[in-house]
């Protein structure tokens, strides 16, 4: 069951080609990692998938063919910059966002409380976000993205700048969502994190998909001893592997 489809997408900014011929599907229940170095195109791709950017050519659609920008309520987005209102409490930030999608406050609160328990954020929901640490702001952004019940959660470097404990908590939440049948797209440049969290990894290099498959298959198909070695091999060579060739 395909929830999100990226088809032959090219995205340019002036003469700069940020993404070049990117295609893949996201299926229900998958946790998919977008892995690449800084500037590889991960954030641009996530902004296209969330409907913030429009492709120069190609399409980004939901499974039924609807362009993503017309159905943003199906998506929960945690950008690299959390964009919280500092004069509002954590819950007020979450509630404001949920109301934009027509979600009843009681429904949003129930969802928020469920995940706040997992993130150890229950006691912080009534606090103003102005004094929040990076980790607390990131957790609030996660709760905000989940409160309206999205079909797909899009995370842009969700553990960047977090301490070890906060990063583990975020990864544990992704695992919880996965166990409950949720669908997550997880951008990271941390290979160990992608291997730990994701069922499937899409390696992006210079705006091109270099590989798409499970961590084990990427290692196997490159005759590597580790995912790090496989990544180096794939991004240094011009070989391109498609998911059709690397089936998990």
Question: Model-found features: residue ranges?
Answer:
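Conserved ABC ATPase "signature" region
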Residues: 95, 99, 106-124
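Conserved ABC transporter NBD signature motif
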Residues: 57-71
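Catalytic Walker B motif of ABC-type/P-loop ATPase nucleotide-binding domains
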Residues: 153-157
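Helix-to-loop junction immediately C-terminal to a conserved catalytic motif
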Residues: 50
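ABC ATPase "signature
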Residues: 212-213
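A short, proline-enriched helix->beta-strand linker immediately N-terminal to the Walker B motif
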Residues: 147-151
């Amino acid at each position: 069951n395909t929830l999100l489809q990226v088809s032959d997408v090219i995205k340019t900014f002036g003469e700069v080609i940020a993404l070049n011929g990117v295609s893949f599907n996201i299926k229900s229940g998958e946790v998919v990692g977008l892995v690449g170095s800084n500037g590889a195109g991960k954030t641009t791709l996530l902004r296209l998938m969330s409907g913030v950017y429009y492709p120069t050519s190609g399409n980004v659609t939901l499974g039924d063919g609807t362009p993503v920008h017309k159905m943003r309520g199906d998506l929960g987005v945690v950008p690299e910059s959390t964009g919280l209102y500092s004069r509002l409490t954590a819950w007020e930030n979450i509630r404001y966002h949920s109301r934009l999608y027509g979600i009843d406050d009681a429904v949003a609160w129930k969802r928020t409380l469920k995940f706040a328990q997992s993130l150890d954020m229950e006691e912080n929901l009534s606090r103003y976000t102005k004094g929040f640490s990076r980790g607390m702001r990131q957790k609030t952004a996660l709760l905000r993205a989940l409160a309206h019940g999205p079909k797909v959660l899009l995370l842009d470097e969700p553990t960047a700048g977090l301490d070890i404990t906060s990063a583990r908590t975020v990864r544990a939440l992704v695992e919880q969502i996965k166990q409950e049948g949720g669908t997550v797209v997880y951008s990271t440049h941390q290979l160990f994190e992608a291997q730990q969290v994701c069922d499937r990894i899409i390696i992006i290099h210079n705006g091109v998909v270099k590989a798409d498959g499970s961590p084990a298959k990427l290692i196997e198909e490159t005759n590597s001893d580790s995912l790090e070695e496989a990544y180096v091999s794939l991004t240094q060579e011009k070989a391109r592997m498609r998911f059709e060739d690397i089936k998990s």
